[in-house]
């Protein structure tokens, strides 16, 4: 298994593993916070409404290891809890993360793919916005391939938003790399990098807090929906 833990300020593969970002005490405190969420909270995108999550986002933003990868004006715009378990298990085919949460719909020829999820507006972001964004996945449990961890297509973020033909070319001709993360690790990734995951075959839980950071200002009159 390759070692993806070495920091790289240009993130050429489109992702970077940072080991042991959370110590045991902080990780257990976060697990305790999650235990107080209502049933069915996994998959919800509004965790930044919670004060503890806002504080965690600020702590992440200021981590020295993240500074080379964040836009100078980066703000946290979303946090989602993903949880795989024997009762809640799924696979995800290779894809890019293209939708962003915004405060309201804006009619502009450059904007498409509008949707409403959980009562909030989402739009397919312009490529120049996505290129400046960073996702930070905080692992509260191990996320090996047996736990349904992520696989990446190396360097695929460099081609911007991919159409179906380009996606097939990348899948056929570029390396697909599995990343095993341990509890407490942080996995950084560009939303434009092709990534996928399989169903978990292990019997434990795989809880991940998926933070999204983006530039403070958006084009075309868009504004972030923070939360």
Where on the chain are the PLM-derived regions?
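Glycine- and charge-enriched low-complexity intrinsically disordered segments
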Residues: 226-227
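Non-heme Fe(II) oxygenase catalytic core, chiefly the N-lobe of the double-stranded beta-helix
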Residues: 2-5, 10-13, 22-183, 196, ...
